[in-house]
């Protein structure tokens, strides 16, 4: 068993923590039998993603789970780590032309689960379309698993931090009047953007696509809520693998950047806002 250090913050919560779901929309209807074979093969290559949680003395550990991982046809999200998922901390479901992979951040983060998803899609498409696609960049069953893939990014020792260099972070932001903690009252909308055009616009402003999206969304919130007296604080997820020298690990390496956006910022050119945001990086958590 391996004790969980990274990802601990997602385990000790009063009401648990919602899983994160990656939805893949295929062009054609999903064939369950092909998906199951692809999932079984991917589980052989990524055994560390099929583990279960074990609590011992108030600490949580990852332990081998011999239950088969099964792709289920349903549009419901099943509780991870429960009997319904064979106690696994990830779950693969499908309906229509959609494949959904749900995972718990105590096990891994988005970048950590992506090679697993890519392996499933590669295997599935080879079966579905009776074609051998290029496997470049795909981690296949039978390949050796580097130790770096399962490395724990956090040690028991604290990193040295120059407290004087750490800038204060704004947490107290404007909340939308319709915001609610009741899941049944939540909804989501989708916006389709031309990728090349958006990336070009971000580069022209000296920003990353994520940073530009955050600024645009924050601006929209303030334009629709001119009465807001507090800044809109956008939380941006950050991959800290490069910073800690653990590029290959699947474990949780997510940090958070807090980007405040005020009514005064609406008068500032995007290029200047991007420069200011980049300069605040040392204060990001």
Question: Language-model features: where?
Answer:
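Secondary-structure transition/turn motif
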Residues: 63-68, 103-107
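Short acidic, glycine/Ser/Thr-rich loop/turn "cap" segments at secondary-structure junctions
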Residues: 96-108, 258-260
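Short, solvent-exposed beta-strand edge segments and adjacent coil->beta transition regions
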Residues: 19-21, 96-98, 186
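A short acidic-Thr-Gly-centered motif at the start of a beta-strand
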Residues: 90-95, 166-168
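Hydrophobic residues embedded in beta-strands of well-ordered beta-sheets
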Residues: 59-60, 99
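Acyl activation and transfer enzymes in specialized metabolism, enriched
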Residues: 27-43, 102-118, 187-226
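Non-catalytic, low-complexity flexible loops and terminal extensions
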Residues: 2-3, 107-115, 119-200
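Acyl-thioester-dependent acyl-group transfer interface
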Residues: 1-57, 67-91, 222-285
